[in-house]
Amino acid sequence: LTNLAFRSTAASEGTGFLLANGYYLSNSTAAAHGLGPLASRIQNEIISKFREMRLDRTELALLKAIILFNPGQAIDAIYATDLSTEGRRRLDVWRDDLYGSLHAYCTAVHSLGSARFTKLLLRLAPLRSISMKCLEHLVYTKLAAE
C-alpha cells in the first residue's frame, strides 16, 4: 500500500492509481469493481498527504521499515510466542532505531523536521487501517468466488 501510494503521487490529483506493473487504474474503474470507498480512502488519507508533504524515497523506505518492525497487536502476540526474550529485545531496539533514523533524517533535511516527523507518524494509523480493509476485501472476494 505504501508503494502504491508513493507511485500514485505522480498521477494527477484524485484521478487514480499507478500500479506496480506500470498500468494506471482510474477511480471510476476501481469503483466499478466495488473498490470505490476503499479507493477514496487511499486517495484522501494517504496519497494526498504524501503528495502534500512531497514524501521522498528515504522517508518511504523508513516508513516501510517501521511498518515491518511494528506490525500491530495481533502480530505482536504471535511474535511474543515465537521470539525469545532476546529476539523481542532486539526487535524493540530496531524499532527505536528506525524511529530515531526517521526523526534524524527529517530534522537534517527539512526546516520543520520534528513537525514533519510527526506528520509522517500520523500516516501509520490510516495505512494500517486501510491495509486491513484491503485484506478484508480480498478475503471476502475470495470467499464470494467459492
Regions of interest found by a model, annotated:
Residues 1-146:
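Nuclear receptor C-terminal ligand-binding domain
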